[in-house]
Amino acid sequence: MKIVVLDGYCLNPGDLDWKGLEALGECIVYDRTSLTDMEEVISRIGDADIVYTNKTPMPREVFEKCPNIRFVGVLATGYNVVDVNTAKEKGIPVANIPTYGTASVGQFAIALLLEICHHVGHHNQVVHEGKWESNPDWCFWDYPLIELDGKNMGIIGYGRIGQATGKIAQALGMKVLAYDAYKNPALENENCRYVELDELLSQSDVIALHCPLFPETEGIVNKENIAKMKDGVIILNNSRGPLIVEQDLVDALNSGKVAAAGLDVVSTEPIKGDNPLLGAKNCIITPHISWAPKESRKRLMDIAVNNLEEFLKGSPVNVVNK
């Protein structure tokens, strides 16, 4: 059995191994494969039985020209890079990795928030540059600092990751306002309740995006919805970049309507030099690393191997195109 991994570098830049897949068949791992040249994708898959992809597209053309494919594993939770309908037509299961990064992504959302509230990186830098040593007072701060206790955290998308973020927010003394199409009353308590979107927008001091990217959520942070928000709101996004209309957020940051934003995702990745967010006020941008702690990546690898093992046993799991 031949296994091809089209783009394995981000998952395993060298601190993990591929032994789990190698034990199941001949395994060829490419660090990267073209996102646009489908001939390269097709050539690399060749006569493989099993294909793993993270961000490399697999449209209909790939399935048509690679007839040996029996199983596709997506090395991520999102699977929009694979034409799952064509795969289903051909009887090919596509399996994703649904829960590997819950804790890491929730933790990172709060890390963005705490950096916005305390400017730890900036103050560390200026201390090392000598500003504290030369200061006439025993302490100083270059930016206003924010206490979160008692403030409202609005979370759009209250699935596993939204709940993980909400749990930490509640531990910091925040009250969670959750918006989700599917409500679980068991999650409600004195510090967490479900609300409609307009109430979340108008009552939240911090808004975190943890919803999937669907047509109905694309651009959910736009000028119309920003106008409904509190003045000085903080916006966090480590879900999907296109949830935000970036120019609308830039305008709101520069006007002060939005006090700050913490973003681990943008509309086009890697970010382009002309992205207006790069020039916006009070905008922290990190390079899509919420998912990337070694513990999280090891969990992803283990689930990816298990997905294939279960398929080979005849009982596939985490299939997204049943």
Curated annotation (Swiss-Prot):
Gene: hpr
Any one GO molecular-function label of the UniProt entry: NAD binding
Keywords: Carbohydrate metabolism, NAD, Nucleotide-binding, Oxidoreductase
Family to which this protein belongs: Belongs to the D-isomer specific 2-hydroxyacid dehydrogenase family.
Metabolic or biological pathway: Carbohydrate metabolism
Function: Involved in catabolism of D-apiose. Catalyzes the reduction of 3-hydroxypyruvate to glycerate.
Entry-linked Pfam families: 2-Hacid_dh, 2-Hacid_dh_C
Nucleotide-binding as UniProt keyword: yes
Catalyzed reactions per annotation: (R)-glycerate + NAD(+) = 3-hydroxypyruvate + NADH + H(+)
InterPro entries assigned: D-iso_2-hydroxyacid_DH_PdxB, D-isomer_2_OHA_DH_cat_dom, D-isomer_DH_CS, D-isomer_DH_CS1, D-isomer_DH_NAD-bd, NAD(P)-bd_dom_sf
Oxidoreductase listed as a keyword: yes
Biological source species: Blautia hydrogenotrophica (strain DSM 10507 / JCM 14656 / S5a33)
Name of the featured protein: Hydroxypyruvate reductase
Entry EC number(s): 1.1.1.81
Enzyme class, broadest EC rank: oxidoreductase
Binding site for NAD(+): R160, I161, D180, C211, P212, N238, S239, R240, D264
Active site: R240, E269, H288
Native organism taxonomy: Bacteria, Bacillati, Bacillota, Clostridia, Lachnospirales
